[in-house]
Amino acid sequence: MVETDLMSSHSSNWKEIFRTHSIAQTIQLEKFVSQQIEEKGRELQQNVCFNYQSFIEASENLSNIRNNLEKVLQNSYEFQSMVSLPKVDRVSKFLSDNESISQTSGDYFIFLQRFYAHAILFVMELFNKEQYLQSSKLLIFCLRILPADLPNDHQCHILVNRLESCKNYLNNRLKQAMTSSLSKVSVVTSWILLNQANISSGLDIFLQECEDQLLILNDAREFSLTFLNTLKLARDFPNEIRSYLEASKNFNIFKEKEILRNICLDECYLKAYFSAEDVKVTTPFETLQQFDGDNILQQWKLSFFSKISHSEKSFFSNATSLTTLYQILEGLLSELSEPQFKEFYELWNSILQNHFIISSRNIIDSLGLYVNKIKEKLQICFEIPPTNSFDPWSFQLKQQVLNELKQNILPACGMDDGFQRFWQSLASFDMVLDESLQVLKKLQTLHLSFTLGDIIPNYLTLADYLLNFVKTSFAQIYELVCSFVNNVAVMESSSEKQLRTSRCLKIVRLLKQFRHMDESVPFDDLIYKLQNILVRELTDFTTGIYINESKINLDVAACITGNFFGPSFALYNSLIMLIDKLEVLGFDIVSDKFKGLLTPNLFESLFILNLERLKAAKSMDHMKQNTFDMEFINYLSDFTNNPREVIDYQHFIELIDLHVQDEFSKEDFDTVRANVKECVPKLLSFFTVLLPRVKAQKVIT
């Protein structure tokens, strides 16, 4: 301290010092001055981070001082032999110019605080710009220069905690970026550098983060593509990571001009405060060693498949039908590249297959619920009475307007708007089942396994399960409808006639929706039984009209013009009214098959009635008229699928009565028959509705 005071008291008179002190004392003084300059430099560095511009100016001044001082040190030996006034004057002037430098020691810890304040912010800035490697390298540099022997006080703890928090934050952000960032290799490499880990550890962390993301995915397509892409990245990572690590092996912050500029450092400060080892980010040798990546991936897949299998996921739950289920799978397969198929098959056999089968089973089971609703609706549809007291068979279409048809006939037949929609839903159900069967056939072309196992026991394939469902469901429907048909068949009283007809029409329309669904269920037999009931109703209706008209219109003069006969009023009116009823029923009921059942029964009944009338004929005109009607019926039968046998004159006489042979000669019979042949082409177009479609077209032409 005495020496310090002495030197301080004579600092303004350097010439006197040199004259009164030895060379050794002068060198000692030079060292002291150098120490003072260095301390002053550190003091200036403490303030540099507060003001960038001031720092630049101070650094330039300090650089000049240090350069001058280095020259003094390099030539200090000259002081021993060249103590001349000019030299003393120059040294005195130099030191006098810098006498404002503080003589107190600089605080390295204060410098670190100010340095970290800039550096940590820039670390975050680099990371947010997705410059992951630069961000990690800078943070590693910050951690490396932190002294191990910092004072154990509150400020030091704060500084250490800030750095550790920054490292933890970067670690978490890097893990998140492993799945969200496009530059995944850079992210994983940054994590390895930051944690001084090896490639195996980096790959484990990457797979773990990808696993967390995969576990929250529920869409089969997104899940599969993400999984396969993860495997591809994991296989490609090692070589790419090695390239990044090799490039970062000798990272030197002196060469990162942008980093230095943003954290307010330049080369002279780095040299002043840091060693060469401090500014390097080295990579441990074991990081670059070979490792068994395939084994890591295989172990991860086994663990991942186990977690997925024990989860409550349902990858195909968004599929509402087997068609959409197939479209999801087909679309997924179309997006796969050839190298990915092998790994997809492994994923399919381990995870997706069971989910696909479960979703298929759920869809098929939901169709079972639909069947139960159909059965409930059928019960209601069958039991509900006609909406009014309208009798479909007593209604003459030509006497009513179209809106009455909608208001009366259709509701009476169970075909109001609500039931119409019900029929449409049945047709839609038929289409769904047909599409489902087609889908199961398509699945067999995908070369994928569909092992049912314990998910659907007792069945070999999904197709077997669906076919059994169809058979069982429609067997239940058949049993229910069969009870309806039996109920209708025993309704014979006149009071039940209207209800029987209404229910007949309902059930026939219903069965037409079902009969194509399952060939093993005899819906056609029920339709045939109901059609026979309707045929009996129509035949009774027509013959009843014929009998009533025959009683009312006894005069046949209007039907005879000279030797030409036309059909009787009774026959004509009964057939026209029958045609009205067929038009009311609609073409969905009155099919060619139905006409094939109706016309033989109808024409047979009308033929027998004509024979009875012939036997009871009271005049030749009546006999000729009834003969005309009988022959006309036979000619109509020729245009059906069941033509009647042609009757000659002798057989005709035997059928009616032999005693009239003299009254009704063969010439009369042939004349009537010729009139029938002439009349049929003129009148047949009125009756084509009665004929099967092919026959009707033949008649029209």
UniProtKB/Swiss-Prot annotation:
GO CC terms in record: cytosol; Golgi apparatus; Golgi membrane; Golgi transport complex; nucleus
Membrane topology summary: Peripheral membrane protein
Localization terms from the record: Cytoplasm; Nucleus; Golgi apparatus membrane
Keywords tagged on the record: Cytoplasm, Golgi apparatus, Membrane, Nucleus, Protein transport, Transport
Pfam families in alphabetical order: VPS51_Exo84_N
Domain of life according to the entry: Eukaryota
TM segment ranges: none
InterPro entries: COG1
Family per similarity comment: Belongs to the COG1 family.
Subunit: Component of the conserved oligomeric Golgi (COG) complex which consists of eight different proteins cog1-cog8.
Protein name listed in UniProt: Conserved oligomeric Golgi complex subunit 1
Name of the gene this protein is made from: cog1
